């Protein structure tokens, strides 16, 4: 486990005009950890021990980016996307719906189903959403904490398509741009707004953000 060296002074974060993207990049540098390979661990503030005031600012920025799209529901996948998706849904004043990775006893009736590959865990997950919560009148904003190769996002798009719902776009906290999933989906016409985009990452060289 290798901690990323914090190279930015706190006073820089406080300067007037610092954007949400810059605040997030600074936080990643300060508190993120690069694990072997392509894993960026940000569980100290984003997806395990959640810094609610900070993540809420990210959610407000995602709301600003999509405020004119008529969003009726926010869609994510369990579990690490739930926090940012919930706060984004709160900003919109709409429900948040998350796809489950297994059918539990409290889900009854018909479901939409797709498959998402987890590169972190090296396995395929069948994800499901109850049909009673997603329909053709919905305008969906997909929210997730990470975008890498695009498997989870593609699975959520598939579920929305099965439901006949309109996807207005996707809001991502951290995109690993170098893994190509985001650009591939953009080429297919999906609007994706990422608050931080990583150009390259390694334990030796640290993180380089896209500019």
Residue ranges of each PLM-predicted region?
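PRPP-associated nucleotide enzymes
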Residues: 1-143, 147-211
């Amino acid at each position: 486990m290798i901690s990323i060296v914090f190279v930015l002074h706190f006073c820089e974060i406080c300067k007037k005009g610092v954007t949400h993207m810059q605040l997030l990049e600074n936080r990643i540098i300060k508190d993120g950890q690069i694990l072997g390979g392509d894993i960026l661990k940000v569980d100290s503030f984003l997806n395990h021990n959640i810094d609610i005031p900070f993540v809420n600012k990210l959610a407000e920025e995602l709301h600003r980016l999509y405020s004119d799209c008529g969003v009726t529901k926010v869609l994510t996948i369990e579990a690490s996307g739930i926090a940012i998706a919930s706060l984004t849904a709160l900003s919109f004043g709409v429900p948040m719906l998350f796809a489950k990775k297994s059918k539990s006893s409290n889900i009854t009736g018909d479901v939409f189903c797709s498959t998402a590959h987890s590169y972190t865990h090296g396995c395929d997950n069948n994800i499901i959403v109850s049909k009673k919560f997603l329909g053709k009148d919905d305008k969906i904003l997909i929210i997730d904490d990470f975008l890498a190769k695009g498997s989870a996002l593609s699975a959520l798009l598939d579920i929305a398509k099965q439901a006949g719902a309109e996807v207005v776009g996707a809001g991502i906290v951290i995109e690993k741009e170098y893994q190509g999933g985001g650009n591939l989906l953009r080429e297919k016409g999906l609007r994706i707004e990422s608050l931080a985009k990583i150009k390259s990452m390694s334990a030796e060289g640290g993180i380089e953000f896209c500019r």
